[in-house]
Amino acid sequence: MIRLVLLDIEGTTLPISFVRDVMFPYAAKALPALMQDHTNPIVVGARADIVMEHPGQDPLKVCQDWMKADVKAAPLKTLQGLTWRQGFEDGTLQADLYPDVPPALKAWSKGGLRLAVYSSGSIPSQKLLYGHTAQGDLTPLFEDFFDLSTGGKKDAASYEKITAAVGLPADEILFLSDIGAELDAAQRAGLSVCQLVREQDGTVPHPGVPQAPDLNAVSTQFGLPVA
């Protein structure tokens, strides 16, 4: 019996196009000015982490290279999160989730399911995104948020940590993602899994795992409350 649904964001609840075409360009444009802020301890800490990992290199150039290569480095995610905070809070950015997502999340929560997020984006970024959607503030629906500080999403140990944190048997947790390697890692940790194969994102079906085109289909497959 599924008691908690653990959700990825990009390609699962939010179109990849929004992240790729809206959020990433916004962060790229704002990052140079942010990196010059020597008073914000979060920026200072992230910059120090980059210098430690890439001595002798310009931290901004490292971040720009990471973005071009779509490297999900923790310092970059932290810095991107700061730029997105400004954008969401001033109304420049507003997350437009897949239309099936808000009603499904509300139905699951109302039906007694626990909900949590596991994304490569920082926890503050996750909360900003779900707090500023075109469908309103959805953060109260979630009890936990996990990011790369828990570990990599393709590492089974990360899902073991999440299982311990939420205090449930692994098979009572359903992990939803569009990425096959993440689903494989979650399966190795004992979680139930389902791949979201969103047609508009061109998701490639991953063999060996259940698949669904949207959250309504997930509800049907796993006997969850239906919106």
From Swiss-Prot:
Keywords: Amino-acid biosynthesis, Hydrolase, Magnesium, Metal-binding, Methionine biosynthesis. It is an enzyme of class 3 (hydrolase). One of its GO terms (biological process) is L-methionine salvage from methylthioadenosine. Pathway: Amino-acid biosynthesis; L-methionine biosynthesis via salvage pathway; L-methionine from S-methyl-5-thio-alpha-D-ribose 1-phosphate: step 3/6; Amino-acid biosynthesis; L-methionine biosynthesis via salvage pathway; L-methionine from S-methyl-5-thio-alpha-D-ribose 1-phosphate: step 4/6. Its EC number is 3.1.3.77. InterPro entries: Enolase-ppase_E1, HAD-like_sf, HAD-SF_hydro_IA, HAD_sf. The keyword Hydrolase applies. It comes from the Bacteria. It holds the Pfam family Hydrolase. It catalyses: 5-methylsulfanyl-2,3-dioxopentyl phosphate + H2O = 1,2-dihydroxy-5-(methylsulfanyl)pent-1-en-3-one + phosphate. Belongs to the HAD-like hydrolase superfamily. MasA/MtnC family. Monomer. PANTHER family: ENOLASE-PHOSPHATASE E1. This is Enolase-phosphatase E1. It comes from Gluconobacter oxydans (strain 621H) (Gluconobacter suboxydans). The gene is mtnC.
